[in-house]
């Protein structure tokens, strides 16, 4: 009997120890310093829901556990790596870009080059064919004036259905042709004056003008000399007292001063 009681007491003692250890463990879990298991479970469930919502949510949370049943949780922000789709339409931009309008106009203006007998040759653009009405209107305007201002040229081109370049080229060709005809003498000066330009007048020869002026001056000098009194050929009365002086000597003596006076008067006129 004593052995039976001893075994019963031993079992009871072991049960008490087990229950006490269970209660102590339960209280330690309910202490404020340790996280509650229910909160931990709810956070884990929330993290699992976030992971299911985003394709990159599996790496959004990290959990570190140690041997003492303590868990520390680190939450990180989830970044959406969707910029590849946003810039998708511009991936091939730059490899083939459409030409600008300036480049297109430049290409149109450049003449076409073809190979003729192994040599490059520029192909001329076809000439503009003007209608009868357009030619008549251009000719009438050319008779009024040979040079057009920019507003006049734009107005004339719009009224005739032509471009300003075509009108400008027509006037340039017409002016060059008109000058050639006028220089060759096929166009009279009156028509050239009517068209807006005055022909150059031939200048008189300078030699003829100088001869006319010189002859007029000489006539004036001669008329002045003819009006003057002729020299006195008689001997003055005061020379009669000197018998050695004759009339021939007096005439010869008085003649040089006469020529001298003529020279002085002519120089004064000139």
From Swiss-Prot:
Coiled coil: none annotated. GO terms for molecular function: DNA-binding transcription factor activity, RNA polymerase II-specific; RNA polymerase II cis-regulatory region sequence-specific DNA binding. Residues 19-64 are annotated as: Disordered. Expressed in the developing forebrain and fins. One of its GO terms (biological process) is embryonic skeletal system development. Residues 123-182 bind DNA. Residues 30-52 have a biased composition (Polar residues). Keywords: Developmental protein, DNA-binding, Homeobox, Nucleus. This is Homeobox protein Dlx2a. It comes from Danio rerio (Zebrafish).
């Amino acid at each position: 009997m004593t052995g039976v009681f001893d075994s019963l007491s031993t079992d009871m003692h072991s049960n008490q120890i087990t229950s006490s250890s269970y209660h102590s463990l339960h209280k330690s879990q309910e202490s404020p310093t340790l996280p509650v298991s229910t909160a931990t479970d709810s956070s884990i469930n929330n993290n699992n829901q976030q992971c299911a919502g985003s394709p990159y949510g599996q790496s959004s949370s990290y959990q570190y556990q140690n041997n003492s049943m303590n868990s520390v949780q680190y939450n990180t922000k989830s970044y959406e790596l969707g910029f590849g789709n946003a810039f998708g339409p511009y991936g091939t931009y730059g490899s083939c870009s459409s030409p600008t309008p300036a480049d297109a106009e430049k290409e149109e203006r450049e003449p076409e080059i073809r190979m003729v007998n192994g040599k490059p040759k520029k192909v001329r653009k076809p000439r503009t064919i003007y209608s009868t009405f357009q030619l008549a209107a251009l000719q009438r305007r050319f008779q009024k004036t040979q040079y057009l201002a920019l507003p006049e040229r734009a107005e004339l081109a719009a009224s005739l259905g032509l471009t300003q370049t075509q009108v400008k080229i027509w006037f340039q060709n017409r002016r060059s042709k008109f000058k050639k005809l006028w220089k060759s003498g096929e166009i009279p000066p009156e028509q050239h004056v009517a068209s807006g330009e005055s022909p150059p007048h031939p200048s008189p020869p300078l030699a003829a003008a100088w001869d006319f002026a010189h002859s007029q001056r000489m006539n004036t000098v001669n008329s002045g000399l003819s009006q003057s009194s002729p020299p006195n050929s008689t001997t003055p009365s005061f020379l009669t007292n000197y018998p050695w002086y004759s009339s021939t000597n007096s005439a010869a003596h008085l003649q040089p001063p006469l020529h001298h006076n003529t020279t002085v008067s002519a120089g004064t006129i000139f």
